[in-house]
Amino acid sequence: MPQTFFVFCFLFFVFLQLFPGTGEIAVCETCRLGRGKCRRACIESEKIVGWCKLNFFCCRERI
């Protein structure tokens, strides 16, 4: 059973390497019509203005 899980994880990793951009979000991906950035946590000089995919926030500079 553990060997099957290891093989599945390895094949999934290989799949992600063959097709970049699938299943992951770039930190520099824009949101809110290009006015924000998708990040796991906003910087102190930014505020949360929405949600990106999964557990990412749409962060925008404070005015």
Curated annotation (Swiss-Prot):
GO terms for cellular component: extracellular region. Disulfide bonds join 31-58, 38-52, 42-59. Keywords: Antibiotic, Antimicrobial, Defensin, Disulfide bond, Secreted, Signal. InterPro entries: Beta_defensin_dom. It comes from the Eukaryota. Expressed in testis, epididymis (caput, corpus and cauda), kidney and neonatal and adult brain. Its main location: secreted. Residues 1-23 form the signal peptide. Belongs to the beta-defensin family. This is Beta-defensin 35. It comes from Mus musculus. The gene is Defb35.
